[in-house]
Amino acid sequence: MLVLGIESSCDETGVALYDTERGLRAHCLHTQMAMHAEYGGVVPELASRDHIRRLVPLTEGCLAQAGASYGDIDAVAFTQGPGLGGALLAGSSYANALALALDKPVIPVHHLEGHLLSPLLAEEKPDFPFVALLVSGGHTQIMAVRGIGDYALLGESVDDAAGEAFDKTAKLLGLPYPGGAKLSELAESGRPEAFVFPRPMIHSDDLQMSFSGLKTAVLTAVEKVRAENGADDIPEQTRNDICRAFQDAVVDVLAAKVKKALLQTGFRTVVVAGGVGANRKLRETFGNMTVQIPTPKGKPKHPSEKVSVFFPPTAYCTDNGAMIAFAGAMHLGKGREVGAFNVRPRWPLSEIVR
């Protein structure tokens, strides 16, 4: 069965073809990054219009890449939510119209479920069950995943998502949009412990997270540096040091919470998905992750246990059609009536989990 996947939740237009027997056949992506850069952020109306312009050419590009035709498509999957309303409608309208024309089922997909399952597109796939860290510009959540459609929310950010905190901190430092990736790049040149920022909620007993206070700590440090220098500009090395300290704090919190989730569930496999999953520091830290089962005071310590960690291929960390095509393929037979164009800009993942 050949499934066409369509992603249009924000500022990337993704189209892909996934074959249930042969795997991913084609993957095409257009990013609107340059278009939104001059505005310093995503402009929803512009995003929607650009999706409309890109969907047909990207679909035809995927078909050519796979050596297939419209008649070979067996189902159409699309991102129903969450995301920008207009952007979602662009993808939904196209998906439903195409499915209607082809007389094929249409499969609505939750955007976060697409990210959650994206590591299964890699050659080396994780086995169920596993702890999943969904970390992006819009969401930071820790899930227990026991199988396709069997997800339990363990914890999440109570305010800013980690990726959002990266972007907002980058803006505080005067970095160009989108700043999160640039911040990570500059952090590579930062000196260890030149600045030390708090790790919010790192010692809380639950798996909740918070990053807004960390952003405030960066602002305080930036204002202090500017006051000391008597200028708005921040010295290059100081800026790099702040970037490193911020990134270290975020990664430390994420790692600590995931370790707690592993101890809570008893799982020893971790999957990291979402845009921040491409972060080099995060990959390095999680790649060396171990857990140690706590022991009563005075008792011999348990040996540390190595954790198996899986990341999606870098190309599938950002929003993409491949993850939607794959998730749709996993839900074949559950398509809703063709012609139902509703989208869900706000759609908690808890509504599809058991």
Curated annotation (Swiss-Prot):
Cofactor list: Fe(2+)
Which cell locations does it reside in?
A: Cytoplasm
Family matches, as SUPFAM superfamilies: Actin-like ATPase domain
Which reaction does this chain catalyze?
L-threonylcarbamoyladenylate + adenosine(37) in tRNA = N(6)-L-threonylcarbamoyladenosine(37) in tRNA + AMP + H(+)
Binding positions (substrate): 134-138, 167, 180, 279
Report keywords, A-Z. Acyltransferase, Cytoplasm, Iron, Metal-binding, Transferase, tRNA processing
Q: What are the GO MF terms of this UniProt record? A: iron ion binding; N(6)-L-threonylcarbamoyladenine synthase activity
Record bears the keyword Zinc-finger: no
Q: Where does Fe cation bind?
A: 111, 115, 319
Q: Which cysteines are joined by disulfide bonds?
A: none
Q: Which family does it belong to?
A: Belongs to the KAE1 / TsaD family.
The role this protein plays is: Required for the formation of a threonylcarbamoyl group on adenosine at position 37 (t(6)A37) in tRNAs that read codons beginning with adenine. Is involved in the transfer of the threonylcarbamoyl moiety of threonylcarbamoyl-AMP (TC-AMP) to the N6 group of A37, together with TsaE and TsaB. TsaD likely plays a direct catalytic role in this reaction.
Q: Which PANTHER family match?
A: TRNA N6-ADENOSINE THREONYLCARBAMOYLTRANSFERASE (PTHR11735), TRNA N6-ADENOSINE THREONYLCARBAMOYLTRANSFERASE, MITOCHONDRIAL (PTHR11735:SF6)
What is the protein name for this chain? tRNA N6-adenosine threonylcarbamoyltransferase
Species source reads Neisseria meningitidis serogroup A / serotype 4A (strain DSM 15465 / Z2491)
Please state the gene responsible for encoding this protein. Answer: tsaD
